[in-house]
């Protein structure tokens, strides 16, 4: 009986050590940041011609172009950066969007409005109505150290819509103050 109690106690203690060792800076950061990750679903209206010959100027001279429209769905990721619903995402995700739906962990959906876009840096700022959103505070990128760990959370391929949790990956800061000619 004492032997079984010893084994049971040892197993519990070992399990506790394993659990404690798995809780580290990366897993804790993901736990803290995940509620602020947003899934961005967009609808874009794209125009197309129904006949490839319409691109020929001679054909268009005699026949008026017949342009059709279709809705195209797309998705991406964003992050809530303020408690009043400002969300940072990529310009290419929301470019030409006629409708933007933001989904937060837990499945709550919001209609979003584009506040600003910058094609050069591929950034866009969205706004959803509401208050007290979980958010991530922006830090000073000048304080980063080359080789420091970084974590990316997101919504590749719309996976967020299936399980309402962002995916995670890690890497390192590989460079700072790089000039890509963006002016």
What are these language model-derived features?
Residues 15-183:
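Serine-dependent protease modules
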Residues 2-12:
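Sec-dependent N-terminal signal peptides
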């Amino acid at each position: 009986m004492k032997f079984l109690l010893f084994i049971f106690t040892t197993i519990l203690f070992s399990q506790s050590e394993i659990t404690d060792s798995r809780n580290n800076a990366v897993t804790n950061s993901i736990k803290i940041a995940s509620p602020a990750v947003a899934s961005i679903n967009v609808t874009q209206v794209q125009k197309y011609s129904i006949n490839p010959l319409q691109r020929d100027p001679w054909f268009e001279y005699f026949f008026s172009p017949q342009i059709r429209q279709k809705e195209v769905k797309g998705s991406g990721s964003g992050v809530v950066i303020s408690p009043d619903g400002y969300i940072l995402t990529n310009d290419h995700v929301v470019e030409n969007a006629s409708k933007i739906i933001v989904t937060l962990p837990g499945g709550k959906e919001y209609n979003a409005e584009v506040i600003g876009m910058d094609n050069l840096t591929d950034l866009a700022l969205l706004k959803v109505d509401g208050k007290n959103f979980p958010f991530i505070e922006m830090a000073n990128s000048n304080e980063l150290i080359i080789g420091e760990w970084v974590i990316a959370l997101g919504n590749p391929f719309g996976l967020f819509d299936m399980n309402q949790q962002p995916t995670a990956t890690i890497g390192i800061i590989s460079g700072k103050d790089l000039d890509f000619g963006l002016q």
